[in-house]
Design a protein with these regions (language model features):
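A short, solvent-exposed beta-edge/loop patch
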Residues: 37, 49, 80-121
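Sec/Tat-exported extracytoplasmic proteins
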Residues: 2-3, 63, 67-71, 101, ...
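Mature extracytoplasmic domains of secretory-pathway proteins
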Residues: 37-68
Length: 123
């Protein structure tokens, strides 16, 4: 594995909140990136801060469903992309929900674990 991440592009919230069924007023902050060429790479990354832990749990469910759907899609065209998606962990810490789909997904997610824990600790 090269460990490289595909070139990512930021997606405006209005383009995907309705698609995912995300309630904008319940999200304090968010970033969502997908591969510039989604037909060749399933790489994506998301960090969301919900207004409360209850909605964070809802976001966690939404993203788990997305990852499952992406995996099913990839299964038909690329075992490599499928494996990458299947190994993705959706993480929740307090009001934060985040994940990274990448060959380096595990390492990048660990970095987010400690970064977000630090933000929460600062309160």
């Amino acid at each position: 594995s090269t460990g490289k991440m595909a070139a990512l592009t930021a997606v405006p919230t209005e383009d995907y909140f309705p698609v995912f069924g995300i309630e904008a007023e319940k999200v304090e902050d968010s970033v969502f990136y997908i591969a510039e060429n989604p037909s060749s790479s399933a790489d994506e990354a998301a960090i969301f801060k919900a207004v409360d832990e209850t909605y964070a749990k809802t976001l966690e469910r939404i993203f788990k469903a997305r990852i499952q759907a992406q995996a099913q899609l990839a299964q038909s065209y690329s075992i490599e992309q499928y494996d990458k998606i299947k190994s993705t962990q959706i993480k929740r810490n307090g009001c934060y929900v985040y994940y990274v789909v990448s060959e380096s997904g595990a390492e990048l997610t660990e970095m987010l674990d400690s970064g977000i824990a630090g933000i929460i600790a600062q309160g």
